[in-house]
């Protein structure tokens, strides 16, 4: 992966871009675009298409040979300005995230990490499912596709208003399948709020509950048909955004893992018993007709009782194509031949299957979730152990105080008996009666305490006896399994020890470890029982409060509607004081609408008052903290802090100016690169024409060489014939031969002149061919240099 400072990715260092494959070139362009080294307005096809195919690449204008560079550049600029700006803002947001993190460290504000955002998304999902469970609805599952769309759209909403076209384009961009419903909320931070990790988390949770305040969004979230959800959360220094996308699917994906190298395992569940999973297709996102892998029912295990299924197959992951997974279903799952081998002649087809779900190819759930769950589990266990330890200490202290008090009471009684014995030695019967009385009172006190303690123990034992027996049974079963496994491992250890130095008896250590294990196991089960009891108690309290709230809400709505009806009836029966005419129905409706609007405004004002009150309390706490911190500081310290703050602000401005210069330089470089690519296409076109001319000239030269050879052969034949004739007859005595000889000489001279002319023409053609070859070589060298060396701006 690329570094945050915009350096070249390590896998592409020292590689000529012309030597990359198409998929590697796309990955290279995406990485350069993510780092901000390429303009995000330009699509991937603009860097790949050329003029060799005779097509008009997007952003290039018309063919370079017909118009000059200025015309092409103007058309290119107009096309670039007409593209949507939303995708650019989302891409630039990732690039500026590092700068915002640096600025947040300088200014003291908190920049939430990915772990916090993941926790926010998971807790929002838990809250939604908890609300659905209270209404006896099925939980919603994560849809990986809409999850990516919602996160992408939340990043867009940080700097923009809701745009339905952009939302639809995002669905197409991520290959969404089926209909879905959108809910979103944008909320600004409270003024002068201390932006911390806890504040951001609490604010997200508070805003999440606002979805249930709106009737439309509440209907979407609590719709029984919706069983999948995508959650997107994002924020900047002034506001937060929460996006929910809900949809209906017939199956859900529970896990996508890679247990072994080049092996994929997918687990899921059918949410509709009338359908069964039949096939899984791995496809190329860029070319959806290209199948990377397709598996049928012979690779799928299906459990009809739980409607859960698992698909396991081999898949080579060395290619760099962007992949997606498609899930095909068929009716009547009982008739699908799961885990049955099919003949080699049978080919998997998707023609009569129903495409129900499409997800991106990625590991799910994220492996980072497991580490975070483990941390959360350890933290909760530590809290439970600390709470248990604190309760144990409190019980011990109470027992010690109670025992000390009882001993003190008993000691006071004995002291009183001794005083009475010293005052009246003769009244032994009274003393013995008093001793018996004190003894009986003390015994009765102890009996009462023991009875109360026994009663408490009996009540607590009755409450947890059944669960404790179940836990002990489960612990005993696990203990037996562990003992059996331990016995097998000990047998293997014995064999290994006998081969080496013999077996050393460790029975005492094993018994001690077993004793520790049993104690720890009992302690863990006790903690689990206490946790379960506490959770059950809290759930009961929550359900009771929820029922009370619903009853009060229902009663409130009834009273509200009754009051509205009463007002309407009174208004209908009322008459105008001037005209004695009844009030029109339209006027009553307008009054009701105005009253409803005022009630909404009143509700918003109440909510705003609550927020302002909370902000007031927080500001008071912050002010107290600042007052406590400012006790040891003096005026000179504040002046020094002010100077340092000003210095840091100047550095920030300098960095922003440098960043602006780099962006301008980047834009200029992109324009030069585009112009060079256009010029390269034009030069390649000229080079092709010159090559075609060169081929034609070579053909003409070959034809003329053949003619010259034929003429030479004819000349040789005529020369031999002439020699023969000379030998047969003399030239002096024959006027015809003399005339013929003179004609031949004239013809030979003409042919020699023609030969010289053709040789001169041949030399000129050779020079033209040589010049064309030199031009072609220079063009190829300039092309290679332009691709290998960085361009300097004009």
From Swiss-Prot:
Residues 89-103, 386-411, 431-445 have a biased composition (Basic and acidic residues). Residues 461-613, 638-775 form a coiled coil. Residues 1-105, 386-458, 774-794 are annotated as: Disordered. The keyword Acyltransferase does not apply. Pfam families: CAP-like_CFAP184 (PF23448), CBM-like_CFAP184 (PF23449), CCDC113_CCDC96_CC (PF13870). Keywords: Cell projection, Coiled coil. Its main location: other. Residues 24-35, 446-456 have a biased composition (Low complexity). Disruption phenotype: Mutants swimming speed is reduced compared to wild-type with trajectories wavy and kinky. Cilia length is not affected. GO terms for biological process: cilium assembly. The keyword Transport does not apply. Residues 774-787 have a biased composition (Polar residues). Residues 49-69 have a biased composition (Acidic residues). It comes from the Eukaryota. GO terms for cellular component: axoneme; ciliary basal body. Transmembrane segments: none annotated. It is found in: Cell projection, Cilium. In complex with CFAP263, acts as a regulator of ciliary beating that connects radial spoke 3 (RS3) to the inner dynein arm (IDA) and the nexin-dynein regulatory complex (N-DRC). The complex is positioned parallel to N-DRC and forms a connection between the arch at the base of RS3, the IDA tail and N-DRC. Belongs to the CFAP184 family. Forms a complex with CFAP263; the interaction is required for functional activity in cilia. PANTHER family: COILED-COIL DOMAIN-CONTAINING PROTEIN 113-RELATED (PTHR15654), COILED-COIL DOMAIN-CONTAINING PROTEIN 96 (PTHR15654:SF1). This is Cilia- and flagella-associated protein 184. The lineage of its organism: Eukaryota, Sar, Alveolata, Ciliophora, Intramacronucleata. The gene is CFAP184.
